[in-house]
Curated annotation (Swiss-Prot):
Catalyzes the conversion of PGH2 to PGD2, a prostaglandin involved in smooth muscle contraction/relaxation and a potent inhibitor of platelet aggregation. Involved in a variety of CNS functions, such as sedation, NREM sleep and PGE2-induced allodynia, and may have an anti-apoptotic role in oligodendrocytes. Binds small non-substrate lipophilic molecules, including biliverdin, bilirubin, retinal, retinoic acid and thyroid hormone, and may act as a scavenger for harmful hydrophobic molecules and as a secretory retinoid and thyroid hormone transporter. InterPro entries: Calycin, Lipocalin, Lipocalin_CS, Lipocln_cytosolic_FA-bd_dom. Changing residue 149 to A: Increases enzyme activity about two-fold. Forms a beta-barrel structure that accommodates hydrophobic ligands in its interior. Changing residue 83 to A: Reduces enzyme activity about five-fold. The gene is PTGDS. Residues 1-22 form the signal peptide. This is Prostaglandin-H2 D-isomerase. It has been proposed that the urinary and serum levels may provide a sensitive indicator of renal damage in diabetes mellitus and hypertension. Elevated levels in the coronary circulation may also be associated with angina. Changes in charge and molecular weight microheterogeneity, due to modification of the N-linked oligosaccharides, may be associated with neurodegenerative disease and multiple sclerosis. Detected in meningioma but not in other brain tumors and may be considered a specific cell marker for meningioma. Expression levels in amniotic fluid are altered in abnormal pregnancies. It is found in: Rough endoplasmic reticulum; Nucleus membrane; Golgi apparatus; Cytoplasm, Perinuclear region. PANTHER family: LIPOCALIN, PROSTAGLANDIN-H2 D-ISOMERASE. It comes from Homo sapiens. The active site is at residue 65.
Amino acid sequence: MATHHTLWMGLALLGVLGDLQAAPEAQVSVQPNFQQDKFLGRWFSAGLASNSSWLREKKAALSMCKSVVAPATDGGLNLTSTFLRKNQCETRTMLLQPAGSLGSYSYRSPHWGSTYSVSVVETDYDQYALLYSQGSKGPGEDFRMATLYSRTQTPRAELKEKFTAFCKAQGFTEDTIVFLPQTDKCMTEQ
């Protein structure tokens, strides 16, 4: 009887370990010595990856958007994005509140009522930034998203390769990674 119980426990443990190995990393690193003042200014969303079904459903209709990062009064960041939706420019602002180390923020979604962590994983401040967001939309609905921001509308091929490698390391598959096409709409200063 003890041998039978041990066998089942061993199989259960192997199953748990197998799931742990297959799961994407829950923690991502943050840009060392993150300098928030250098991160401010205009960025373009050049790439996205997400485990959310909306990306697969809407990715053909998505296009690049312009985002402006400005300091918030609480030491966090205001991330204001302007994008094309139903042939009109729409603007949304997210307040990223400081959450621990520099480069780590939290965001409370008014739509979902959930709080997400947002990390600046890597940036050179002049050309690109890799951001990673994670949280939960509800019970059992984990949400993960990686974003490639570029200072220009035409990021270099090496940056796209870097973003793809980062996404795959986080468990995203090719069909969940999209590079957003350029658009002339909603990109001018307003």
